[in-house]
């Protein structure tokens, strides 16, 4: 009788242990399901979050002699902040501001506003204060004060916290990283290219041009744009080409800019004609890509009064932002 009662107690204890183990296993299983569900919900919510970035860009910052005279102070210094008085509030609304500085900044050369462009260092303070983050230097005037002037221009911008593109000193172009800006968690690659350098490239060796400048070599452009497509979320191209003062893009512009879209570009901000040219939305792989063939001038002294003989002179006073 006693053995029977002891056996019953042992069985009851065994059952309790088994039930406890089953409950523990079920509890752990339920906890694991909750953790997995929570992770899935977090991933789902993260994937559903829309990230946005406001990018602003404009046409040429073209500093003619008249702008130097208006910026000259009594002590002989230059203050260019007034140039941006009315647009600064707009620029400050952007998450990323891109510009095109069409000239050079070389302290070893005199100031010049045409046909060669060379501005004082103080111009960069005004540009930075206005809100610019990136400045395109791939244009036909970047050699106006020599290759050294291209380097000093890039350095002047870097000193005030603006990233230059289109000029490479060290490392050289083929070894340089792409400029990719993190904007609200979105990786934005910015590249720029120039159609030529007003013949001043003839003063350089082919190697110097290849190492330090960014021209419209299709093979190299394709490689860099495809690389940007892999490394960034958005790819912005700022090419300089076309015909000055022409209100429509050339066939060459249209063809090349569409190639850039095919290679991976998402946005193309064109420049050089000094007048605004049409924009176009291109559909690729179910997405919309933007082309502005020319953004015109943003700061310059090109206007009706100074553009004798140019039928589209009035349009030099207009630009895109």
Regions found by a protein language model. Name each.
Residues 2-321:
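Acidic, metal/ion-coordinating pockets
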